[in-house]
Amino acid sequence: MTPIDNDELKCLIKAIGMKAYVEILFPALIKDKNISVMELCQKYPEFNKYTPDAQNTRRSKARKIFENGWEVEALKTISLSTRTNSCVRAKAKDLELKYKK
């Protein structure tokens, strides 16, 4: 695990979007870190609302979080954020507790 750089983590989360990370990318990548954009679009139809470039960016930024071992810390950051709705924060907290190392 790479030491956590909170500024970099926040930039990655911002590029992905908190809701997209919690509801789409974290659940997908926790099961398969090499999931393709096409598979994401098939499994999570709401991912289709993003342009192809945005889909690639969001997936690659989320993979970077996982590669650094920051996936649970990202959930914690989101669960403490005041910049997303309470449902997303609650789901992030539930996932954080479930996957905490």
Spans of model-derived segments:
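Basic, low-complexity segments
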Residues: 1-7
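Short coil/turn linker and secondary-structure boundary residues
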Residues: 4, 32-35, 50, 83, ...
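Short, amphipathic alpha-helical "recognition" segments used to contact nucleic acids or chromatin
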Residues: 9-35, 62
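Short acidic, hydrophobic short linear motifs in intrinsically disordered regions
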Residues: 36-40
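Short, basic interhelical loop/turn and adjoining N-cap
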Residues: 42-57
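DNA major-groove recognition helix of helix-turn-helix
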Residues: 59, 63-66
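Short Lys/Arg-enriched helix C-cap and helix-to-coil transition segments
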Residues: 67-83
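Helix-turn-helix/homeodomain-like alpha-helical modules used for DNA recognition
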Residues: 87-101
